Amino acid sequence: MQWFDMCEDDVDAWDFMGLPARVGGCGAAVTSAIRDGAYVASKFKALRSLDHHKAQLPPGACMKQETATAILHSKKRFGMEQRSARCARRLELNSMIFSGKFLRAVTKDMTSEAFAAAVRLRCGAKVATLPPMLSCICHSYNGREWEQREWVDHVHGLASLPGVNATTRHDGVTKFVFHDTVSPFCDAFWEPEGLQQFRCTECGARDVTSADAVSHATTCGIDVKALKRNRSGPDNEIWWEGVNQQYYDFTVINALCPSHVNSALDTLVSAVTRTKHVKYVESKKIPPNRFTVLACFTLGGVTEATRRFIVKCAGAAKLEDNDLAESFSVQLQHGNARILAQALRGALRAPA
């Protein structure tokens, strides 16, 4: 899921999210393209090779030639199944979308309806093939377990699922929900080894470390997979009694929100999570910043490009003294696509 691991010239491809704002019928075309699964990870990876072909195109030439090259490259490299009718449709749509003709369509008055239309995912693409930011905005968590299942027709945007919030608030931290499947293991990318803690369903212990997980499970006579992760890392997950555990794609920490102003920069108020967070930052050599972005196991780590993108999103929301979980999540729930569109433009070109 290294969606943001793209070269800088590919940034404009993200602008498809704002296309329906002013181009009328193009909105249906974009939705259709998404529905057909045109924007899969392999396709965007294939776009890296287009610079060579762009240089060879004469002025005013149709984009179909390079789009065809991208699809053929994608098919060759990633083994995509060729469907002639669908490929022809994608050629037509992509020649329009990636021609640069509509890249200025994102405007300040873009409505949540327009944004929802751009990301309405009635498609055959799997959850894992979608960009993490897009998936969390569109409520990738709907109260049920995800098993890489296809998006369904009733996912219409930010406020279409009653009772479901894009984020969960805890300790002034915004956590973007991905799914609620239970697994006892943490990926070393997002938490230093030895800091994981598990909750034993047999004896009720909440401080079982990763090093003691196997022996503890043996002592209690249960499978090690029965251990549930318990408030591990800097609020990447949290256990609510009587409710399924929830896991998150990434956590955004606002060091300047009211609950953090009396603590060290980029640390949380909770002593336990502060200690873990400091160790995480030191181990990953993350530079101090107002917003700290931590990846969860579902992402397998966050590249610097991804980190800059999310920080750009948070900064565009003008979160001065407001709690990030209140302000940023409210912006997402209200479908303020302008914030995201502005953050997307040039996000990967920002200096490290």
Predicted features, each with a name:
Residues 1-352:
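Nucleic-acid-interacting cores, centered on viral/eukaryotic replication and modification enzymes
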